[in-house]
Amino acid sequence: MEVHASVGAGLCACTDAAGTEARRQHFFKQEEKMIPSAEVRAARERLVRRHMEAENVHDYETVIGTFAHPRYELIATDRTHDGPAEVRAYFKESRTAFPDQRNELIALHHADDAVIVEFWLLGTHKGVLSGIEPTGRSFRCRMTAFFLFEGTGLICERVYFDSATILRQLTS
């Protein structure tokens, strides 16, 4: 089956009968999604804010506790940290390299199954990161994180960023 492009309400233009059925199934699944109530949206937003503030003060047990199942997906580096042990290891590695790492919230956006956050990530390179010796330089990078939910349970933080922006600031 060949996929050409995105059309309309998230449907894909497919060239065969199976594709037509896939479009129909996808459309009806989209229609079945429930728009979260104001109460659910407020609960999700409180949880995301608590999560981000706990990251800022390096209270990683609270961060892990905000998840129904802890999972970080860092798209720029193609790394996934799944489960409490892997998430703790990620915090240890990243905060060893950037002990003052913190985030500054820019905006929150709500979707059916996510809270989308725009934020600045800041830090000073004081420890080895992936073989790169500390430079003592600071970085500031605009990022987007999708906090994915099942109901009010946080199941994943998927982070998008430009790693070249950070690398350029650390090495120039």
List the predicted regions and their residue ranges.
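Residue-identity detector for glycine
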Residues: 8-10, 19
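Cysteine-centered motifs
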Residues: 12-14
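Basic polycationic patches enriched in arginine
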Residues: 23-24
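C-terminal and inter-domain tail/linker signature
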Residues: 27-172
